[in-house]
Amino acid sequence: MNIAGNLYLPKDMDKSKKHAAIIVGHPMGAVKEQSADLYAVKMAERGFVTMSVDLAFWGGSDGQPRNAVAPELYAETFSAAVDYLGTGPFADREKIGAIGICGSGSFAISAAKIDPRLKAVATISMYDMGAANRNGLNHSLTLAQRKQIIADAAEQRNVEFQGGATKYTSGTVHEITEKSTPIERE
């Protein structure tokens, strides 16, 4: 799977040396050209080699279905960026870190837990998307509801394996009611 990224180099960089590098991941539901590029540019202005990335399934990166929610593959996006930077001419492979914005904060941390090549992680307005997907926003799903979601997903796998229609979830409520949370109303 190809991962799209924008590479930024410090102005007046000594190209005969390797430099510390930072990978910047965008918020959930965004693309690199939004806030991730801004952070990448600003960190390049401070002397870092930087790369903003589109998470797998988003923006210019490969992956179907588009805009899928796959936290384990999002963590892999950061490792793929380490592969690229660490084998290129500008980045010191022993000095590569990550900045994760919003949902990418949790994906960067997940990547660093399993990829020791990521030497530092910083988060900006981090939101744990994995926990939100497992437990609902603000832990709003009961254990029984979570078990039902898993059972429904298992049954849907059977349906799709046997040629049935793919079922997608929107990730958002379909109707605003008096019981809707402020986040749902937003």
Where do the model's predicted regions map?
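Conserved alpha/beta-hydrolase
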Residues: 42-62
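N-terminal cap/lid segment of alpha/beta-hydrolase-fold proteins
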Residues: 1-21, 71
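Alpha/beta-hydrolase active-site loop
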Residues: 35, 68-89
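Structural cue for short, hydrophobic secondary-structure segments
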Residues: 24-27, 52
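Alpha/beta-hydrolase fold nucleophile elbow
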Residues: 89-102
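The serine-hydrolase catalytic nucleophile loop
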Residues: 29-41, 55
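Alpha/beta-hydrolase-fold enzymes
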Residues: 107-186
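Active-site glycine-rich loops that stabilize anionic/oxyanionic intermediates
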Residues: 19, 26-31, 102
